[in-house]
């Protein structure tokens, strides 16, 4: 059947993807709202996507599902975590859910159908394409894309996320990293004082 003037088919939902809503990955097209991690359902972008057997994942879920397993493997502060992804629903024989809920926080039916603006994760105001940054799978204004503790400007590659908030690596390690003897402030941390 000819595709008269229509776009490519979405790799997730199978419907037609028109140019204005298209995201391309690994030779396939997706609607922006369908370009989600197969496990945790977070929005993806070119810096957060990982592909395995034609399925798309965020880097975190990909690492948990296909990365090295065992004691001591992790990502940054708190790496001695034995979480194997059970809380995210990762099981050896898991199958993806056929229902794909929308991730657009805008509850207006018109906005969901016709691409209403997403809401900034920090201030809650509308985020438009010209000022939008994706970090931790969520939209932010460029000016709101800062560490929650120190206010330092972040990039998608220099942030860490905890409970929906973003931090620079230094503040994350200081506030959520391992505590106790041997975890210190650099070269002088284990100095014996008399």
UniProtKB/Swiss-Prot annotation:
Keyword vocabulary terms for this entry: Developmental protein, Differentiation, LIM domain, Metal-binding, Nucleus, Repeat, Zinc
Pfam families from the UniProt entry: LIM (PF00412)
BP GO terms, sorted: cell differentiation
Ranges of residues in domain LIM zinc-binding: 10-61, 120-171
GO cellular component terms, A-Z: nucleus
Motif (Nuclear localization signal): 64-69
SMART domains: LIM (SM00132)
Function: Totally down-regulated in transformed cells. May therefore take part in the control of cell growth and differentiation.
Protein's name in the database: Cysteine and glycine-rich protein 2
């Amino acid at each position: 059947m000819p595709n008269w003037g229509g776009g490519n088919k979405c790799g997730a939902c199978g419907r037609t993807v028109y140019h204005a809503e298209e995201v391309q990955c690994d030779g396939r097209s997706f609607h922006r709202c369908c370009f989600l991690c197969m496990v945790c359902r977070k929005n993806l972008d070119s810096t957060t996507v990982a592909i395995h057997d034609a399925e798309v994942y965020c880097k975190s879920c990909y690492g948990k599902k296909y990365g090295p397993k065992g004691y001591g493997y992790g990502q940054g502060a708190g790496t001695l975590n034995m979480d194997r992804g059970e809380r995210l629903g990762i099981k050896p024989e898991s199958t993806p859910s056929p229902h794909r809920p929308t991730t657009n926080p805008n509850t207006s039916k018109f906005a969901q159908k016709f691409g209403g603006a997403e809401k900034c994760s920090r201030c809650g105001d509308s985020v438009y394409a010209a000022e939008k940054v994706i970090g931790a799978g969520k939209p932010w204004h460029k000016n709101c894309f800062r560490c929650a503790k120190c206010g330092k400007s972040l990039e998608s590659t220099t942030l860490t996320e905890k409970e929906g908030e973003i931090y620079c690596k230094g503040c994350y390690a200081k506030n959520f990293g391992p505590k106790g003897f041997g975890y210190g402030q650099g070269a002088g941390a284990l100095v014996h004082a008399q």
